[in-house]
Structures are given as C-alpha cells and as structure tokens.
C-alpha cells in the first residue's frame, strides 16, 4: 500500500558502568539474532554503540541511528542501564521509542552474568516521567532474547502509526452536512497530535473537478474500474464521471500535501454533492482507501483520522461504517442463535452507502444510493459499491475529539458473521461480545458519533498502545468490558 511509512527501528543497548559492558553487548547480539531469524532484517538496525553511563555515548548512538535512517527507537537494557543517558537518548530521538530489558539467562551464571535489568527498568521509567518523555513499554518488558524479539516486532505497527501521524495532513471538503452535528471536529486536538489539516469548500473541489473535464487519463481509469467491478458493473454510464473525480482527488493530494508525506481525506457526499457533481463518491472513496488513502464520508475528520491509524496498524484496507441498525428477531433466531456464541444484544448491522473496498466484500455491485433516490432522480445517486462485508475477525474503533475538545477513543474486537444481510449498501452483521452494554455506556454515554472505523482483523492490542502513546487518558480509552466488569454509569441492580 502507498501512503504508509516504512518503519526502521534502531536497537541501542545500554549498560551501567559498574556492570560488564560485554553483558549488554552480547545480549544485544542475541536479541538481534533471535529477531532476524524469525522476522528478517528489513525493519531493524543494530546500533554498534553501547551507551555506558555517558552522554557522549548517547550522542554517538543518536547520530549513528539517524545516519542509518531509523525512524523508531528501541532502548535495550542489557543490564541495570544508565538511567540518565538512556532516557536522554529517547528525549533527543525524533520518533517513537520503546524500552525493553534483558532477563537473566541461567541459574549457572548469577554472579558475573547477572544484569539486574529488572531493577533498571524501574529507574528508566522514573526518569522518563521526570523528563516528560513518551515511551512504549510492553506489558512484560523484561524477557529472554526470543521474548524481546517478539516485543520488538509488536512495536512495528505501533511505531508506524505514530510516525504516520507526525507527517499526516487531513484534507477536508465542505462543512459537515446539515443536521449532522455528531460529525463536529474540534481541530485543536489535531494540532496537539501533530496532524495538519487543510479545510476547503465544496466549491473549491467542484472547480477542480470541472477543470478535469476531458482529461486524457479518464479512459484508462475507467478501464481500471471496469476490471475491478467485473460482472458487478451495473452502472457503466457513471464510470467516466467517477474516473474524473478520482483523478481530481489524486491531483489535489499531490498539489496540496505540501511538506507532509501522508494524506487522509474527509469528503462531502450530500446534500448538494450529488445534484451538482451528478453522482455519489462512494466507489471512489473505496478505491482511494484501498490505496492506503482513507476517505471518510460526511466530512468526518476524526473518522478519516481513525481510518488512517487503523491502516498504519493493520497495513491493510479499512473502512468507515455507521453503527447502523439492529438485527431483526427472526434473523437472529434463524441464522445466529445456536450457531454462534452471541446473544441478540451482541449483534448489530454496520452499514454505509457504498464506501467499503471491493476486496473487503463477498461480492460487489455498482448501484445507486437508495436512501437519496427516495427524494432525488436515481441517475444523480449512482456510484455506490454494494455488497455484504467479508466475514471474519474485525476491530471496531474510533479516536475522537468530542464536543468538549478532549481526546477519547474506543476499541472493541469482534467479527463479521457469515450471515447474509438481505439488505443494501456496504453492510455486514457484526458481533461484539457485550455490545449492548458497550453501546449504552460507551458509545451513548461518552457522546461518540455514529461512525466507527473497522480494521479487518484483531488489532486491539496495538491500537490501545497507539492511543495511550498519543495521549488519550486511560479513563477515556474505552473497550467492551466483559460481564462482571461494570461501567461507571452502569446500574448494578
């Protein structure tokens, strides 16, 4: 996928001066051997400088990993470690940092070979807090070479999201639609996250679209679309307009991303879009999202931000859906009950008009926006990509600056069930354990909008760490709590 950072982690071993430097160096070598044997060499770099209680060593290591092109850092305590210089390294490194430490290897070498990194990690964490330095520390940060190799690998998607956010520009078109206050987007928190935003009017976009009339690239783009749609190409007459619109967006990105490397788009799709452009943009949105450029509907700025984070974490296509409607009783009784271990309240339908990428649908068909067509001519509502969403594991999540301009987030893992929806749009039957309680005491209670981002797989662990790292307070980092774990607002009776 394009529009994603490549992560390269610089691994720097550190050593307390009253411990053998060789202990840290040899443990670093063992860590790198364990990592490269299991995961390869692409995403890591072994820094030859071991920091031994020295700010000069720290500067040398910093320069070395910069020269090697590292954009993420792993500080590895091979022994107790030098708490000042090791945390200064994280302070001066321009990128996400993690701290891990070496466990003792054998009962037969607990004199000269004992490193005490278990103790050193405590001092490291204290010094990080003193200096207000952000760092990712895994759940069990002290481990064997093999265990630390796994921790290092788990850091890659976390680092990719953090690096991506630091170089992201969101491009929005138009204000949110009338009567859609839920999609309000206080932008202060975007700047706090290091994200840039360029806000444009629909008129700017319409002008750019008209300037692409007759663009010589349109026929080739139409052929791409025809190949993707195959037998589902039921509205071939709208493809030239959709191709023109896709070229407009791609050209806008190149002309407007400025000094930023990555882009996400919050686009308008109603109420005037379809009457003026002559189509709905859903299919084009799905195609760009498949390229790694998330495009949200209804000018949902934090929606496309959430999609971008999920794209970074999963390195895969995501989507944005309405948490939309209940599953009818008869459908639950006939197709779910007794076949899957979910209550009726655990299930719901996630839907959007047609913005989910074709690779995430069981089959796809180019259609028209049925809801809009109730009040508009059908021909101006063409452009939706419809089909049931692929069954399998999912993570439903969202990062949001709510009406009070505070950062909040939620994460809930579940699945799309292999049950036909018998409905329209891009839609699936979702099942999330304890969804009913989560819906009431997180989504409603904490004023989240009706849009949720969907990653195709279970990525809750990495997303949770990303949200913590970027500053979401843990009391506002919500998840679907299991039975017996009451929400603060939940009635215990």
Residues covered by each model-derived region:
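C-terminal catalytic subdomain
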Residues: 289-424
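Periplasmic-binding protein-like
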Residues: 70-79, 98-100, 262-267
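Short, well-structured alpha-helical segments in soluble
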Residues: 57-70, 86-89, 248-258
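Cap/lid and interdomain-hinge subdomains that line or gate substrate/regulatory clefts
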Residues: 2-9, 101, 105-222, 226-234
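Long, internal scaffold/assembly segments composed of regular secondary structure
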Residues: 222-313
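N-terminal basic/disordered segments at the start of proteins
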Residues: 1-37
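Extended hydrophobic packing segments that form well-structured cores
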Residues: 371-493
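Short beta-strand elements in bilobed, periplasmic/extracellular small-molecule ligand-binding domains
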Residues: 32-52, 134-140, 195-201
